[in-house]
Amino acid sequence: MPPSGLRLLPLLLPLLWLLMLTPGRPVAGLSTCKTIDMELVKRKGIEAIRGQILSKLRLASPPSQGDVPPGPLPEAILALYNSTRDRVAGESAETEPEPEADYYAKEVTRVLMVEYGNKIYDKMKSSSHSIYMFFNTSELREAVPEPVLLSRADVRLLRLKLKVEQHVELYQKYSNNSWRYLSNRLLAPSDSPEWLSFDVTGVVRQWLTHREEIEGFRLSAHCSCDSKDNTLQVDINGFSSGRRGDLATIHGMNRPFLLLMATPLERAQHLHSSRHRRALDTNYCFSSTEKNCCVRQLYIDFRKDLGWKWIHEPKGYHANFCLGPCPYIWSLDTQYSKVLALYNQHNPGASAAPCCVPQALEPLPIVYYVGRKPKVEQLSNMIVRSCKCS
C-alpha cells in the first residue's frame, strides 16, 4: 500500500493546475482567472508527473539506479513493449472525444412514432416476424437543429404482457430498403407492462445529417437456425388499430417514441463557428494560435527533467496539459450577475468560471527495471489528448 499522499496524487493532479496561477490582471470576457507564468506551469507539471508515476508503480521512491544492467533490452521485452505501445496508439485513433456541447445542460424532448395506420406503413410487407416504426425527421430537426447538439437518443417501446421468453432484434432502415442490425434484447415472460429502451444516438445523428423525410426501425424476432417458429410474440403498445375514442388516444400517446437529450441552440451559439466544432485535441490545438481552452504541449524527458535513468523506454513523452480561459456564455445584464457578485463576495480567491480540464487521456507504456529484472507496465491516464470546459 503506497503512502496516502501518493494514492491521492492522481486525484489531486487537476488541482495542481489551479495552484499554478500567479497574481495578475484578470483576462477579458468576464473570466475571473488570472495571468499565468508558463515556466511555473511546466515546473509544477513536471513535479506532479514525477509523483504520479511513482504512485502508479506503487513506489515510495525511484529504484536504485546502480541495479540497472547496462546494454540493450532483451528482445522479448522490447517486443512486448512495442506491441503494447502499438495497441495504445490504435485505440487512441479509434476513440472520438465527447462533443463540447456535453458541458451544457440538456433539454429532453419526445418525438412520437408516425401513427400506425399511416400510408407510410403500406410500403412495408405485413409480417408476423416484425413490426416497423417510422419517424418524421422534420420533427427531429425541430427538436435538434444540428447533429452536434445531440447528446443522447433512445427509442422507447412499451411492451405489454408477454407469455413466453423472446429474443428480439432492432434494425435500422436504409434508403435502399435494406436493414442494418443495431441491437438485441432477451425479454422474460411478464404480466406487467415494461418500457424497453435502445440507444440509437449514432443513428439519429445520421438522420439529422442525411435529410431524408422519413426514417425508421424494425423490431424482429430473432431468427434461429434451429427454430421453426420466428413469430414476434411480444405485444408493443401502439400497433393495434381496433381501438376507438379516448382509449385510442391514450393508446396512441404511449406508442413508440424517440427520447432526445440535446443542448438548446441558444445555449450553445458558440458551437456554430467551425473553430468550436473542432475537438480541442492535439490535432487542432498544436496547429493553431487558439487562446481559449486548449491542449498545450509539455514534453517530459525522463533524464533531463526528472533525473531518472531507470526508465529505459520511452526516453520521454508528451504529457501535455490543458490551459486557457473558458468564457462565460451569460452576460452581466442577466439575473445571474447577482449570484456571481454574491459568490465572489464570499469566495474572493475562487473562480466562478468553468475551468479548462482534460477530456480524453491516454495511457503510457514503459519499460523499467526492478533489480535486474525488466518489466513492461502501462501507466493509465498519463497523456492529455483533448480538453474541455467544465
Curated annotation (Swiss-Prot):
One of its GO terms (cellular component) is nucleus. Glycans are attached at N82, N136, N176. Keywords: Cleavage on pair of basic residues, Disulfide bond, Extracellular matrix, Glycoprotein, Growth factor, Mitogen, Secreted, Signal. A motif (Cell attachment site) lies at residues 244-246. SMART domains: TGFB (SM00204). Residues 1-29 form the signal peptide. PROSITE patterns: TGF_BETA_1, TGF_BETA_2. Belongs to the TGF-beta family. Homodimer; disulfide-linked. Interacts with the serine proteases, HTRA1 and HTRA3: the interaction with either inhibits TGFB1-mediated signaling and the HTRA protease activity is required for this inhibition. May interact with THSD4; this interaction may lead to sequestration by FBN1 microfibril assembly and attenuation of TGFB signaling. Interacts with CD109, DPT and ASPN. Interacts with EFEMP2. Interacts with TSKU; the interaction contributes to regulation of the hair cycle. Interacts with TGFBR3. Transforming growth factor beta-1 proprotein: Precursor of the Latency-associated peptide (LAP) and Transforming growth factor beta-1 (TGF-beta-1) chains, which constitute the regulatory and active subunit of TGF-beta-1, respectively. This is Transforming growth factor beta-1 proprotein.
